[in-house]
Design a protein with these regions (language model features):
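Short, structured protein-protein interaction patches enriched in aromatics and acidic/basic residues
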Residues: 21-31, 37-39
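An N-terminal amphipathic alpha-helical segment
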Residues: 1-13
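Residue-level detector of alpha-helix initiation sites
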Residues: 27, 133-136
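A short alpha-helix capping/helix-coil boundary motif
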Residues: 10-14, 119-122
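Short glycine-rich, basic-tinged beta-strand/loop micro-motifs
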Residues: 12-22
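Rhodanese-like catalytic fold shared by cysteine-dependent sulfurtransferases
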Residues: 5, 33-89, 96-127, 136-170
């Protein structure tokens, strides 16, 4: 995953230096942008060359901040117990292809990179359980939604260890 390697590289850079991160996953754009924002670094942009995405991130301060973990975490078991409750919404922030191959029944898919522009689709009256593959993207999504006043819970460990019913749309 580009973020893990980027974190290691950022620790070796001087403030103001720029790192290029190459990836082929379209979801890496949203992941790196959200991570950079949450750690105080500056996401400069992406250049697409064929199937390769070249992301650029500038180290903004002398010490990289750790991305804060969202304070409210629930387990997969909790989500399974409440998934049919009309006062809850399961929000899957994985990429569309990931969601299509396997997702929690009734979950709504808004990829992390689209969350900011599609936030109006969410109901502020509902408790939103945010899920991704491992809890990293959902953590970033929870921070964004919490800042906008939503009642959110980060689902850990997420789809990587989901043992309950799933749906497939492909």
């Amino acid at each position: 995953m580009p973020i893990v390697r980027t974190k290691k590289t950022m620790k070796t850079l001087e403030p103001g230096q720029v790192v290029e991160v190459q990836a082929t996953d379209k979801g890496s754009t949203a992941d790196l942008r959200a991570w950079a924002n949450s750690t105080g670094n500056q996401y400069l942009g992406t250049i697409e060359e064929g199937d390769v995405l070249r992301h650029y991130v500038r180290k903004s301060s002398g010490d990289e901040q750790e991305a804060p973990a969202f304070k409210s975490v629930v387990t997969n078991e909790t989500v399974e117990a409440v998934r049919n409750n009309p006062d809850t919404l399961i929000l899957d922030v994985r990429e569309t292809a990931e969601y299509a191959f396997s997702h929690i029944p009734n979950a709504v898919n808004i990829p992390l990179g689209e969350l900011e522009t599609r936030i109006g689709e969410l109901d502020t009256a509902k408790t939103i359980y945010v899920v991704c593959r491992t809890g990293s993207r959902s953590d970033l999504a929870c921070q964004q939604l919490d800042a906008k006043g939503f009642n959110v819970q980060n689902v850990i460990p997420g789809m990587s260890d989901w043992k309950y019913d799933t749906h497939q749309t492909v």
